[in-house]
From Swiss-Prot:
It comes from Epstein-Barr virus (strain B95-8) (HHV-4). SUPFAM superfamilies: P-loop containing nucleoside triphosphate hydrolases. Residues 88-106, 148-160, 194-203 have a biased composition (Polar residues). One of its GO terms (cellular component) is viral tegument. The gene is TK. This is Thymidine kinase.
Length: 607
């Protein structure tokens, strides 16, 4: 090393091969090693044969570095340099004599590390060697010396007892795990690193007296219980690890799948929406399953998805958006329904907020679906090989049916009802499948489902929901026989439904039937709502827009009481009605783009 008498500058023998390479990179390494060698003598005074004193390196501070740049020796809690290994250990591992230049290196070797072996030797595991303490090489190292030097353990019997408790706990913990003095996991040389017994520790603390204090006697008396507790804890840990290994046979694969799922769930859906894709145009008929809660809409959708596969796109109910995005609208709505605080403005405001949140996913998805419609191809009658777009509910339920039920229950004011009704939209080709079921069977299925927020719903609630669907269906029938302007005139009180029937040049419905339909429809409720302000143009436009939009829909009625646990039979009934009704038509969609959009909605609903 540079600056040492009789020594040549340059890296140690283990790196001579790198020095022989004349590449620019290795030349820089050589200069760096030379700088380190020049710097070494000025940092620490060399010991051993280089110093001329012939003294041993008891502290083990001067070791051969394992890699360049070398690391400084670690320091303990008290700021003192922690001894790593003795000079004898370095000599045995590296093959260097105690007087060689490697022992004069001012840098320490981390504990357990080994300098790189020469090119002709295979790397071997380091062999632990006993360390020598500052007080002399003949004494056993005390691993708790750093603990006794800290400020938290200095002074008094309490500090001695705390140190003893840590030491005793470690010994009993090793005994509980079955690690004796000659454990299989340690070599014989490592037995010298054993912590001193409690008696020797007390002997050092009490001035050579072997008899412990009162607290030590108490701890020693309970040492057997402490050992038993540690042993039981170790057995329980090994048992739990065995059970987990049995249950997770492919732990690495499960970890990869979990990471992939987290990465997939963190993907932003808008990126998928806007990415380019090859359009795949297919004809498809859009069906929207409607009905009271618990009639079996989701069960039917899952069955059809399993049967038809890629020929079907299933749009689930946006339950996650309703329950996990901001506040839980489902919980808040059922809370207001079960408390039955009728006729209050604050209740109506809370119900309005919930209903507006219910309408948002339907309006967003309808707008996105409309953008993927191929209008140039037009529409045609439903064919047997057409695809199907199956929705769990339509915007009709969130903006018309349930608001009407809440209005009749006096949970929603007239003004708030108009606000929700104005959000109703529909597209030509939307077909509503009204799944009817008697209240008793519906209640049984609702209890079987066991949703917590539905526990307060009773048969009266289900009956009111069915009545609201019936009112909307009767209103839709009127739109099939009369012009929207004539119906609005009836709602405004300018004429009657009977007069409209008599003035028709080609009456296709009798006045008695029309009168009955009108009384059971939502139009009779609208007449009552707008009566105080029937001259207001905004209210009249809301009624007119609702009537025109309602006429776009088509209805399919299915009585589920006739198909008890018969999903294929129920679908056959829906399918045959769709084929026989010429007003129900298929439209051409970008099937690839629509599949991506729906998959993002499904992913958000699952997360």
């Amino acid at each position: 090393m540079a600056g040492f008498p009789g020594k040549e500058a340059g890296p140690p023998g283990g790196w001579r091969k790198c020095q022989e390479d004349e590449s620019p990179e290795n030349e820089r390494h050589e200069n760096f090693y030379a700088e380190i060698d020049d710097f070494a003598p000025s940092v620490l005074t060399p010991t051993g044969s280089d110093s001329g004193a012939g003294e041993e390196d008891d502290d083990g501070l001067y070791q051969v570095p394992t890699h360049w740049p070398p690391l400084m020796a670690p320091t303990g809690l008290s700021g003192e340099r922690v001894p790593c290994r003795t000079q004898a250990a370095v000599t045995s591992n590296t093959g260097n004599s105690p007087g060689s230049r490697h022992t004069s290196c001012p840098f320490t070797l981390p504990r357990g590390a080994q300098p790189p072996a020469p090119a002709h030797q295979k790397p071997t595991a380091p062999t632990p060697k006993p360390r020598s303490r500052e007080c002399g090489p003949s004494k056993t190292p005390d691993p708790f010396s750093w603990f006794r030097k800290t400020s938290c353990t200095e002074g008094g019997a309490d500090s001695t007892s705390r140190s003893f408790m840590y030491q005793k706990g470690f010994e009993e913990g090793l005994a509980g795990l079955g690690l004796d003095d000659k454990s299989d996991c340690e070599s014989e040389d490592e037995s010298n690193f054993r912590r001193p017994s409690s008696h020797s520790a007390l002997k050092q603390k009490n001035g050579g007296k072997g008899k412990p204090s009162g607290l030590f006697e108490h701890l020693a008396a309970h040492g057997r219980e402490f050992s038993k507790l540690s042993k039981h804890a170790a057995q329980l840990k090994r048992l739990s690890g065995s059970v987990m290994n049995v249950l997770n046979l492919d732990d690495a694969q499960d970890t990869r799948q979990a990471k992939a799922q987290r990465k997939e769930s963190m993907r932003v859906p808008i990126v998928t929406h806007l990415t380019n894709h090859v359009p795949v145009i297919k004809p498809a008929c859009s069906l929207f399953l409607e009905g009271a809660p618990g009639v079996g809409k989701t069960t039917m959708l899952n069955h059809l998805k399993a049967v038809f596969g890629d020929l079907t796109i299933v749009v689930p109910e946006p339950m996650r958006y309703w329950t996990h995005v901001y506040e839980n609208a489902i919980k808040a709505m059922h809370k207001n329904v079960t408390r039955a605080r009728h006729g209050r403005e604050d209740t109506s405001a809370e119900v309005l907020a919930c209903q507006m949140k219910f309408t948002t996913p339907f309006r967003v998805l309808a707008s996105r679906k409309r953008s993927l419609l191929v209008t140039e191809s037009g529409a045609r009658s439903v064919a047997p090989l057409d695809c199907w777009i199956l929705h769990d509910r339509h915007l009709l339920s969130a903006s018309v049916v349930f608001p009407l039920m809440l209005l009749r229950s006096q949970l929603l004011s007239y003004s708030d009802f108009i606000q929700v009704l104005a959000t109703f939209t529909a597209d030509p080709g939307d077909t509503i499948v009204w799944m009817k079921l008697n209240v008793e069977e519906n209640m049984r299925r609702l209890k079987k489902r066991g949703r917590k927020h539905e526990s307060g719903l009773d048969a009266g609630y289900l009956k009111s929901v069915n009545d609201a669907y019936h009112a909307v269906y009767c209103a839709w029938l009127l739109t099939q026989y009369f012009a929207p302007e004539d119906i609005v005139k009836v709602c405004a009180g300018l004429t009657t439904i009977t007069t409209v029937c008599h003035q028709s040049h080609t009456p296709i419905i009798r006045s008695g039937v029309a009168e009955k339909l009108y009384k059971n429809s939502i139009f009779s409720v609208l007449k009552e709502v707008i009566q105080p302000f029937r001259a207001d143009a905004v209210l009249l436009e809301v009624c007119l827009a609702f009537t025109r939009t309602l006429a776009y829909l088509q209805f399919v009625l299915v009585d589920l009481s006739e198909f008890q646990d018969d999903l294929p039979g129920c679908w056959t009934e829906i399918y045959m009605q769709a084929l026989k009704n010429p007003a129900i038509r298929s439209q051409f969609f970008d099937w690839a783009g629509l599949s991506k959009v729906i998959s993002d909605f499904e992913r958000g609903n699952r997360d």
